Regions:
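Active-site beta->alpha loop and helix N-cap motifs at the rims of alpha/beta catalytic domains
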Residues: 1-164, 245-249, 282-304
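Conserved, mostly hydrophobic/aromatic
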Residues: 18-19, 50, 112, 173, ...
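Glycine- and other small-residue-rich loops at beta-strand/loop junctions that grip anionic moieties
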Residues: 162, 184-185, 218, 254, ...
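Glycine-rich phosphate-binding active-site loops on the catalytic face of alpha/beta enzymes
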Residues: 118-127, 175-191, 278-285
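Catalytic-face loop-and-helix region of soluble metabolic enzyme cores
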Residues: 208-274
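C-terminal extensions of enzymes
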Residues: 255-306
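Short helix-capping segments at alpha-helix termini
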Residues: 87, 144-146, 202-209, 272-273, ...
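Aromatic-anchored, glycine/proline-accented short structural segments
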Residues: 169-222
Length: 306
């Protein structure tokens, strides 16, 4: 069963691989080389789909110095059309709606083949950010322009830990047309389980079926990468930080932690009857970290009931 049918039927148990497009300064030839190598790496895994991120500068959200400088990347839709057009499974394209005018979004959505393209809309990173199109308007446009385009939303366990209402945001997004959710990178498994539990019982109380939640896992090859994850707003429990800091091999230790987190979430969702997917994120340009992400995806592929 392909990814679209799994999501529509709310069955879950699928595997995605998430990528950041090359830097904006990358030549067309180099971008094609990157795309070709990516396909070679992922082909043996049999992933059910790809995610392409839409990277935005989030310094307005966090005034602290960014551990790694912000470098603009290619538009994920352009990268897909020009360099990954032969990819064989569905692709989820992120759209940071604040960056695009309503006409931009209309034009893009109207040309999407809904059999092989899906979307996740992400709102502005802070109230101070200039907004070309709000998340709510973008959701409405999708209903008007291309209602068959499967739409996803973001799920943020950390926000649920702080405010306790993320499950209500998920239900509201579901009512606005979202067919699935994708989490931020999960390091705090308890925060993710709390969100899943509250969402599951809220759906039960309202008499609606939960939609798939895709949990994002990522490896971490250095303490500076860990610092960057925190800058992005991801909660990393101190015991995990201690494990990674004192490990003989930080990267290998992070793979073990990510796998354990994924397996715990799989078991929990199956028990609660919440459909789920797994996304392994690879955003590093370091070959060792990319290969570790592929290795993690391979391990998790064997644990899914696909």
């Amino acid at each position: 069963m392909d990814l679209r049918r799994r999501i529509v039927s709310r069955q879950g148990e699928f595997l995605l691989f998430a990528l950041t497009p090359p830097r904006l300064s990358t030549s067309s030839e180099q971008a094609q080389e990157i795309a070709d190598v990516t396909r070679e790496r992922l082909e043996p895994l049999g992933v059910d789909g790809l995610i392409l991120y839409d990277i935005d500068d989030e310094s307005d959200r966090n005034p602290d110095e960014r551990p790694f400088p912000f470098l603009p990347t290619m538009d994920p839709a352009d990268y897909l059309d020009r360099h990954l057009q032969a990819w064989p499974t569905p692709v989820v394209v992120y759209r940071a709606t604040a960056k695009y005018t309503e006409q931009d979004l209309r034009d893009w959505m109207s040309t999407q083949d809904t059999a092989g393209r899906m979307a996740v809309f992400v709102g502005a990173s802070s109230q101070e950010k200039p907004v070309a199109t709000t998340l709510r308007i973008a959701q409405r446009l999708r209903t008007e322009v291309n209602p068959d385009l499967l739409l996803g939303g973001v799920a943020i366990p950390e926000r649920h830990a702080r405010k306790g209402a993320e499950h209500l945001r998920l239900v509201a997004k579901q009512e606005a047309g979202c067919s699935y959710f994708v989490s931020q990178i999960v390091y705090d498994v308890n925060a993710a389980k709390n969100l899943v539990s509250d969402y599951a019982y809220e759906c039960r109380d309202r008499g609606i079926d939960p939609v798939p939640i895709v949990f994002t896992l990522s490896v971490c090859g250095s303490m500076k990468t860990l610092e960057f994850l925190r800058w992005l707003g991801i909660d990393v429990p101190r015991w995990i930080e201690n494990d990674l800091r004192h490990a003989n091999d930080t990267l290998d230790a992070s793979v073990e932690h990510a796998e354990a987190t994924a397996l715990e979430l799989m078991s929990f969702c199956r028990r609660l009857g919440v459909p789920f997917g797994i996304s392994v994120e690879s955003v590093s340009i370091r070959k060792l970290e990319i290969e570790a992400s592929v290795r993690l995806a391979g391990r998790l592929a064997n644990r899914l009931m696909r």
